[in-house]
Every structure is written in structure tokens, then in C-alpha cells.
């Protein structure tokens, strides 16, 4: 009897994590989606995460409340910090942006590790990618390698020689590559959400919107999300 391997998939509801989930599902994993209600200004992404998890047919979808607004430190968790708007890609990659949430992936990957170990899952899947690690310190390959060592040393499974693997299938990909990949897996882009604002329409001006719109345009595709504005890219 063949046992389907369990996998925990970190799911925000955006392009990247949705592609990772549909990929894991296509590879035959029994997928357990994990999302966080962490006080993000764009709580609309949680609606997207629920829709994507349902579309993918996950075994379980956990949404963990975690109030990172208690200390802020990011434009995503502190409403007094303005979101960057109307920036080009070159400007975005010059420094760590104010949308970086302090230690967010360390927190998320730690919770995912606990969830995976409790499930006796063999892997945690996360959608970090090349565009992210140009700006975010907790999306870079050396960071993932360090967290993999934490997974090996900090768990019963790891100490017994079967560490839970951190799977990063998008690590070397750009947004255009990710959209191509997700398209092949049938990701319903209209159900995803990338915008840092919290309306029923994406703003079209934040970094996340501009990266997404530029990638769809480069591929000659129409992004099915409704946008408040369609700025020149």
C-alpha cells in the first residue's frame, strides 16, 4: 500500500504561494495549508487564501491568529507607515523595503515546522523567490539553508535522521517564470491577491501590484484581478 506523503504549504493567497500549493498538489502530496492572520493591513489576502485552498482541495487549511501589530515595524503591520507607491523595479531592489515584516518568515517557518512535525509530514513548502530575496533578508538562499539546519537540529524527526525538508521550488524564479509555472498547474489567478491594500480592487500602485502587472504584461497576458488604476509600467 502506497502512503501519500503529507506536506505543509505556507499559503498567503498570492501568486507565489498559490503556485507552490498547486504544484505540491500536482506532485501527489496530501496538502495541509497554513495561513496567518498576523494583523496585516491587506487582510483581503486571507479571503484569497481560503479560496485557493478550496480550489486546490487541501486536506486541511489552518489560519493562525498572530498579532504582529503589537510591535509593528513594517508598513504592513503599522498603519502609520506609508506604503511605497509608483516605484519602478530598479528602485524596489535598492534596499530592504518598509514592507519587510521583522522576522516574519522565521516565525512562519517555525510554526510550519511544529505543524509538520505534529502531522508527521516530511516537508514544508514556501514560495520565496528571486524577486523577494533581492529585497527581503528572510527570503534568501542562505537564510533558507540556515532554517533547514534549525529543522534538522530542533526536531525529533531531525535528530532521528529524517529532517523535515524546506521545499522552495520558486527560489530561482522571477514573476514571469512563476506565472508560466502556475498557469501550467491551473492556478486560478482571479482568486489570488497580491496587493498590499485592503480593498475589493487591487490598488495598482504598490510594489506588489506593479510587479504582478509587469509580469502579466511581459507575458502578453491580462491579469484577471480588478485594479483601481492601471499605471504605465
From Swiss-Prot:
The entry's keywords: ATP-binding, Ligase, Metal-binding, Nucleotide-binding, Queuosine biosynthesis, Zinc
Enzyme class, spelled out: ligase
The protein's Enzyme Commission number: 6.3.4.20
Residues annotated as binding ATP: 11-21
Cystine crosslinks: none
Leader sequence residues: none
Cofactor, how bound (note): Binds 1 zinc ion per subunit.
Any Gene Ontology biological process: queuosine biosynthetic process
GO terms of molecular function: ATP binding; ligase activity, forming carbon-nitrogen bonds; zinc ion binding
Residues that bind Zn(2+): 195, 203, 206, 209
Cofactor: Zn(2+)
Involved pathway(s): Purine metabolism; 7-cyano-7-deazaguanine biosynthesis
InterPro entries xrefs: QueC (IPR018317), Rossmann-like_a/b/a_fold (IPR014729)
Pfam families hit by this protein: QueC (PF06508)
Catalytic activity: 7-carboxy-7-deazaguanine + NH4(+) + ATP = 7-cyano-7-deazaguanine + ADP + phosphate + H2O + H(+)
Task performed by this protein: Catalyzes the ATP-dependent conversion of 7-carboxy-7-deazaguanine (CDG) to 7-cyano-7-deazaguanine (preQ(0)).
Similarity section: Belongs to the QueC family.
Official protein name in the record: 7-cyano-7-deazaguanine synthase
Organism: Thermosynechococcus vestitus (strain NIES-2133 / IAM M-273 / BP-1)
Amino acid at each position: 500500500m502506497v502512503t501519500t506523503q503529507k506536506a505543509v504549504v505556507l499559503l498567503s493567497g498570492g501568486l507565489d504561494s498559490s503556485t507552490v500549493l498547486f504544484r505540491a498538489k500536482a506532485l501527489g502530496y496530501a496538502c495541509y495549508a497554513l495561513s496567518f492572520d498576523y494583523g496585516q493591513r491587506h487582510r483581503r489576502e486571507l479571503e484569497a487564501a481560503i479560496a485557493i485552498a478550496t480550489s486546490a482541495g487541501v486536506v486541511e487549511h489552518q489560519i493562525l491568529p498572530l498579532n504582529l501589530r503589537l510591535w509593528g515595524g513594517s508598513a504592513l503591520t503599522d498603519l502609520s507607515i506609508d506604503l511605497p507607491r509608483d516605484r519602478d523595479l530598479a528602485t524596489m531592489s535598492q534596499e530592504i523595503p518598509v514592507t519587510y515584516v521583522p522576522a516574519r518568515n522565521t516565525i512562519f517557518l517555525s510554526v510550519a515546522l511544529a505543524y509538520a512535525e505534529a502531522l508527521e509530514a516530511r516537508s514544508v513548502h514556501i514560495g520565496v523567490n528571486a524577486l523577494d530575496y533581492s529585497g527581503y533578508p528572510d527570503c534568501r538562499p542562505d537564510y533558507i539553508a540556515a532554517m533547514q539546519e534549525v529543522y534538522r537540529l530542533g526536531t525529533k524527526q531531525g535528530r532521528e535522521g529524517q529532517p523535515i525538508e524546506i521545499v522552495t521550488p520558486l527560489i530561482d524564479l522571477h514573476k514571469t517564470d512563476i506565472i508560466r509555472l502556475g498557469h501550467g498547474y491551473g492556478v486560478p489567478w482571479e482568486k489570488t491577491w497580491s496587493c498590499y491594500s485592503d480593498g475589493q480592487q487591487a490598488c495598482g500602485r504598490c510594489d506588489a501590484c506593479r510587479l504582478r502587472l509587469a509580469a502579466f504584461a511581459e507575458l502578453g497576458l491580462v491579469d484577471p484581478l480588478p485594479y483601481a488604476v492601471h499605471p504605465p509600467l
